[in-house]
Each structure stands twice: as C-alpha cells, then as structure tokens.
Amino acid sequence: MNTEKLETLLGFYKQYKALSEYIDKKYKLSLNDLAVLDLTMKHCKDEKVLMQSFLKTAMDELDLSRTKLLVSIRRLIEKERLSKVRSSKDERKIYIYLNNDDISKFNALFEDVEQFLNI
C-alpha cells in the first residue's frame, strides 16, 4: 500500500473516531444507533413496521447482531427518537415507527452530523 492510500485510510479513521466521540458526547448515541435510525427512516417513516420484520431487514442491511440491534432500538426509544406500540390484538407483536417529532429530531441530528463532517 502506498503512502497516499495509507494517509487516506488514516483520514477516514480519524473522521470516524471524531464522529463517534462527538455523537456520544452530544447525544449519548453510537454510530450503530445512527445506522439503525437511518434505516428506520427508510422503512418506518410512512407506516408502523412489525419489530420482527424490521430486525430481519436490519440484520441483513447493517450486518449487526440481533442483540446489538435491540440495544440500539431500545436506546433510541428511551431517547425518544423512535416510537413503539404494542398490538391491541396480539400483545406479543410490537410495531416501531417514526412520528412527526421523531422525524424532526432525525432531521436535526443528521444536519448536525453533516455540519460536523463538513459535507
């Protein structure tokens, strides 16, 4: 690997590390949480999605374990960045979705990340 490619790779790492520390300090979130939040925006913005279905999709798309996904989802719900509701017909079924407040917080968070990264 030549020096230029190595420097580019190191630059990516520094940017990744800086972003990780920034969102942890400011929002108490991880990069996994951001990835899950972005995926929920793509799949749960317009309708409530069954948690099991979302987990399968997220495991495939994000290549994260079920445990890590559940931790991120729980954290996002606690931070009121994602909403959930239990089915009235079957208590075992849980749906996740983004309400208008969640979407506003999503947009503000990702605008802040864009400013931090200068993109």
UniProtKB/Swiss-Prot annotation:
DNA bind region? 55-78
GO BP: any one term:
regulation of DNA-templated transcription
Indicate yes or no for the key word Protein biosynthesis: no
Q: Where in the cell is it found?
A: Cytoplasm
Say which domain of life the source belongs to. Answer: Bacteria
Q: Which UniProt keywords apply?
A: Cytoplasm, DNA-binding, Repressor, Transcription, Transcription regulation, Virulence
Gene3D superfamilies referenced in this protein's UniProt entry, alphabetically: Winged helix-like DNA-binding domain superfamily/Winged helix DNA-binding domain
Q: SUPFAM superfamilies from the xrefs?
A: Winged helix' DNA-binding domain
Induction note = Transcriptionally activated by MgrA. Expressed maximally during the stationary phase of growth.
Q: Name one GO molecular function term.
A: DNA binding
Q: What Pfam family does this protein match (any one)?
A: Staph_reg_Sar_Rot
| A GO CC term attached to the entry | cytoplasm
Q: Which InterPro entries match?
A: SarA/Rot_dom, Transc_reg_Sar_Rot_HTH, WH-like_DNA-bd_sf, WH_DNA-bd_sf
State the family named in the UniProt similarity comment for this chain: Belongs to the SarA family.
Functional summary from the UniProt entry: Involved in the regulation of virulence genes. Acts as a repressor of the agr locus and consequently targets genes regulated by the agr system such as sspA, hla and hlb. Binds directly to the agr promoter region.
Official protein name in the record: HTH-type transcriptional regulator SarX
Originating organism: Staphylococcus aureus (strain NCTC 8325 / PS 47)
